[in-house]
Design a protein with these regions (language model features):
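Signature of dsDNA virion morphogenesis modules
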Residues: 1-265
Length: 265
């Protein structure tokens, strides 16, 4: 791996750190193709783990200096690095014949690009990358049935200040000193689930549906046989397996090993 660990990032100038992070991203982008070696792609993912770690270190240093612009800049780098890493993992997982896991990495890459543009104005290139990923979605994956779940909560709090969201000045999705404002739902309760065309989270979707032969996966189209206690009736309503809620708001931040397993030689 050619991305070194920055032992003392505080001794580097802002330009040096930015150049270092951009160089690591540019090197990884060379491998954004299904034709590239999976082994080399995985090595790049691990290199991006290191790059992300260093971006986080310099972000924390900016926070200690009370430099909000720099903190938000490096938050953007965390998002952009995570997006590239997620896209690399998507290709690896597709080549492993794991389309559902690959779909989640594609969505993570899209979320990372979008968050990078929200974090700081220096990531306009991520807007172009997001459009490319949306095109890639329709070229690689079949159309999906998306779901959206509605919830009610006792109160909504701000993740930045901890106050009621309706009374504070922070805005959801905006960066503040290196972190995004999120709304925390206190004591949430499910209200409804609906099929939608444009979900807030594309990971929420119909995963499989029942056929006379078993559960058919909507991505791989493979059929999993029924368990002994399962039955299928032609006159019944359509039964599906679905995901209608995800807990991880920042899936692109997940390190390589947790998704792909350990790097083997």
């Amino acid at each position: 791996m050619s991305v070194p660990l920055v032992e003392q990032p505080v001794r580097m100038t802002l330009k040096q750190v930015v150049d270092y992070l951009n160089a690591g991203i540019a090197e990884a982008e060379v491998f954004l193709s299904p034709a590239r070696s999976s082994k080399l792609q995985m090595e790049q993912c691990v290199a991006l783990d290191v790059l992300s770690y260093n971006a986080t270190r310099v972000k924390h240093e900016a926070v200690r200096r009370d430099d909000e612009n720099a903190a938000n800049l490096f938050l953007g780098f965390e998002c952009a690095i995570g997006a590239i890493r997620s896209e690399l993992m998507m290709w690896i997982l597709l080549k492993r014949d794991m389309p559902n896991e690959a779909w989640n990495r594609l969505v993570a890459a899209q979320m990372g690009c979008l968050d990078a543009t929200r974090a700081h104005g220096s990531f306009a290139d991520c807007e172009r990358r997001l459009k490319d990923l949306e095109k890639l979605e329709s070229q690689i994956f079949p159309p999906q049935v998306f779901l959206s779940a509605g919830f009610v909560a006792n109160r909504l709090d701000c993740s930045i200040c901890g106050e009621r969201y309706s009374k504070c000045e922070h805005l959801r999705g905006k960066p503040y000193m290196g972190q995004f404002c999120e709304v925390i739902h206190r004591n949430p309760r499910a209200d409804h689930v609906a099929m939608v065309k444009a979900p807030a989270d594309k990971r929420c979707r119909v995963v499989s549906f029942k056929t006379k032969d078993g559960h058919r996966d909507r991505l791989s189209w493979e059929i999993s046989p029924y368990r002994d206690d399962e039955v299928f009736k032609d006159d019944d309503a359509l039964e599906v397996e679905s995901i209608f809620l995800t807990a991880d708001r920042y899936p692109y931040m997940v390190p390589t090993e947790k998704i792909l397993g350990p790097l083997t030689s």
